[in-house]
């Protein structure tokens, strides 16, 4: 392990990102988000009033100084590709900066799509090698967090690692959804199990397990060797968590990087923020938290801005209707182009161009872009998908049986409404 002086670390913080390429795995289906991902990949799902989930990984790259980025796409990629083309065309080709869209090459006989996360990189190796990077940063495109990847790169170099895995403690009950590791005193990974049925607890804390975040730094040449060998292994599932990381661990070449060392947060005493938002409840909670008085995720930090595609929209408007009722909101996010007329909105997130007509009560709701809510509606604990038209007088979130019959209701009581569900409901009512 190499110990670096402060000036050396500052120099590396500038140099290492320039020697790196980031690969964002953005082809996931996100099946636990149910109908919300029927027509879009999970990284393209709207989040936080104006963003897409992938904007966080892309913004982290930009803010960390990594300006060579490959986005590996697959499932329902049109919306994602369109978003990146419109909102992330700021890089200069003359300066060797880019966001490259890398669809499935479908080069394997008998295989149409990527066989696993590692295969997603393998299929694009011919392109990736042309980047001539010394380090490859592998990222998931479907997580919400702020991280300075330059700090993780410095940690990788200091430890003399060939592979570094970002990690953080998670409740033991949630650890079955992650790769779980054990480390020694030097943070070398000595054991790694992907999504174990009985996760091993952290030493000294039976309530937590040390989980992989799916964020990796590799020496480029080492990664290429690993992927070439994995590609020829018929017994492999060609996945980083299931195959590549366990193999490196057995070889003693993998080190852990504690997420708090590179997490970007304005309050140093706050808990490091990282969310998977892979279920409807997690997605709903993470959105509504941003509307709270003190959100866990600081979206107002000008030193680490989250970038996205910005439409030219008029300001949000709150108006009095003809009866004299005022449009009001409390503890809510209301985006550009929204109009709230004579209704009350509480603890909710309204995406661009939402229209709420008179006499409505909106409470703990997430309304995606272009939702239109008719008069006298009551919406509670729900997610309304893009461009839904909620009929006059409709009540959602108050009757569990009725909600489950008409829409999708999760075990936690979160109701998801889509245009297709509303269309089917209308057909039934017209019979």
Swiss-Prot record:
Binding residue positions for alpha-D-glucose 1-phosphate: 114, 179, 194-195, 212
UniProt name for this protein: Glucose-1-phosphate adenylyltransferase
Cysteines joined through disulfide linkages: none
Family: Belongs to the bacterial/plant glucose-1-phosphate adenylyltransferase family.
The protein's enzyme class: transferase
BP terms from Gene Ontology: glycogen biosynthetic process
Enzyme Commission no: 2.7.7.27
Activity regulation note: Allosterically activated by fructose-1,6-bisphosphate (F16BP) and inhibited by AMP.
Organism from which the protein derives: Salmonella arizonae (strain ATCC BAA-731 / CDC346-86 / RSK2980)
SUPFAM superfamilies: Nucleotide-diphospho-sugar transferases (SSF53448), Trimeric LpxA-like enzymes (SSF51161)
Gene name of the encoded protein: glgC
